[in-house]
Amino acid sequence: SVRDNLILAAQVLRGFFRPFTKAQANKFADEYIKLLEIKTASADTPIKSLSGGNQQKVILGRWLLTHPEYLILDEPTRGIDVGTKIEIQKLVLKLASEGMSVTFISSETDEMLRTCSRLIVMRDRRMVGELSGNELSQSMIMSTIAGGDTE
């Protein structure tokens, strides 16, 4: 269910010998369904019946419920609808503005420009460029990707 998936990582941290009560699990689920605007009939809905974008939000919520200081998101918006993609990007920006460190991995340059304050370009497992501030532009990103080093 959506509830079980949302609390999974927090339950692992807490320990399976100290399970959340049904009331606690419902409270967490309701809070994160609202926070992430997960479109579901209820917290009891099987996760497989949700859209891909809402499944992605549940997975993101699973980790946010652990209150991490650092979040690594690898292509979190790949294959989901445009509306949900924008919602996730806004959430990432909000988390960063609240002090969370976020590594956002994406192959979409437009998305990188919307979500990143600093961008690292990798090729063959090596860093080939770092862009920030005025350097963050479509042309600079494409030049760095194509092989023009910025270091």
Placement of each model-derived feature along the sequence:
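Glycine-rich phosphate-binding loops of nucleotide-dependent enzymes
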Residues: 1-151
